[in-house]
Each structure stands twice: as C-alpha cells, then as structure tokens.
C-alpha cells in the first residue's frame, strides 16, 4: 500500500540525470489493457516491454522522461486557443518530431494484479502549457491525444519517481497518478532536464544534443 504522508515535489538531482539515466526505449505504440482511458480517464501509449531486456537492473515503478512520435504518422499540433492539442496523420514538408514530457509506469500495476510487465506512457502537454493536473485547477482532465496505434515512439527515461503501490480505491490510484504528473512536470522544468525538450542547441551539452538527435531521428 502507498505510505501515508506528503509526496516530494520533484524527483532526481537538480544537476540532471545520473546513471543509469537517460534510458532509451522505443517501439510501435500497441494496444494495452484498455483501462487507461476507459476506467481511469488517463490515456496511455504502450510500447513492447522487450526493450527492457537491455536494462535488467531497471526496477518496476513510476518514471518521468521525454518522448517523440514518428512525424510521418503523427504530427503534433498545439491548439493555442484552448491550451490543448490535436494531431493529424502525416507530417507536412519539413515537419519534425515534437519532443514532449511524459510520465510512465514500468511493471505490473498491483491494483490490477497484471501478470505481464508493461510500459505504459502518459504523454503530457508541453511545459509551456497550463497543467491540467495542477492542484486547484478545477476538474482534473488528463491530457489526451487522438489514437496513434502503430506509430513508432521513442522514449528517454530521465528519472525515477516512486515504486509501484496497491491502493484502497480507484480514486486513490487516480489521485496518485495526478501527483505523479505534477512531480514529472516540475522535475522536467529544471534547466538540466528542460534542455532535453527545448534547450538551445548552443547551451546544451554534447551528451544532451546526442540524446535529442536520437530521440527525433526516425
């Protein structure tokens, strides 16, 4: 069960990711258990878990990082009027992959007692957009994108947030995921992490630039 008490507002050192991070994972977006949107109202993009074989010491739990989707199949667009997003299939001429913040779980989800390990990624809105999961923001509506099954997704895991927990209720699970989103968002807003999303190429380290190139190269 989740321990009582307040959560830390950020995860990971302020100086930036430390080994083993960043962790690279990629694969086509596949159908998951079908619970994220239907039961929880939290859309997730699942990718095959086979890539975890390269990281045998990576523990189950909740993580944060950044993702990119193949722009040839999914073109990200931001609706400036509502602070929400939409997409259209197929990238326009010269369009590149957008790098977006993400929170994800790796494991078995004790609340649902899954038998197989999964990678479930919730893609969040850009850090420059209002947070739909901020406390006091009114009704919580998790960020939602149109379906993009089959689209190649690349993921850089930049840090670890917490272990997996079981919960006394569905509402308690949803609330902890809301907090996970806020912890991920605040963690990624720190300069040493934000550079993975939209850092000035001249200001980023060579290591960060190399990771960004991998992320958007489809």
Curated annotation (Swiss-Prot):
It is an enzyme of class 2 (transferase). It catalyses: riboflavin + ATP = FMN + ADP + H(+). Its cofactor is Zn(2+); Mg(2+). Keywords: ATP-binding, Flavoprotein, FMN, Kinase, Magnesium, Metal-binding, Nucleotide-binding, Transferase, Zinc. One of its GO terms (molecular function) is ATP binding. InterPro entries: Riboflavin_kinase (IPR023468), Riboflavin_kinase_bac/euk (IPR015865), Riboflavin_kinase_dom_sf (IPR023465). Mg(2+) binds at residues 44, 46. Residues 1-27 are annotated as: Disordered. Zinc or magnesium. It comes from Neosartorya fischeri (strain ATCC 1020 / DSM 3700 / CBS 544.65 / FGSC A1164 / JCM 1740 / NRRL 181 / WB 181). GO terms for cellular component: mitochondrion. Its EC number is 2.7.1.26. Pfam families: Flavokinase. It comes from the Eukaryota. Signal peptide: none annotated. Belongs to the flavokinase family. The active site is at residue 120. The gene is fmn1. The keyword Chaperone does not apply. This is Riboflavin kinase. Catalyzes the phosphorylation of riboflavin (vitamin B2) to form flavin mononucleotide (FMN) coenzyme. Pathway: Cofactor biosynthesis; FMN biosynthesis; FMN from riboflavin (ATP route): step 1/1. GO terms for biological process: FMN biosynthetic process; riboflavin biosynthetic process.
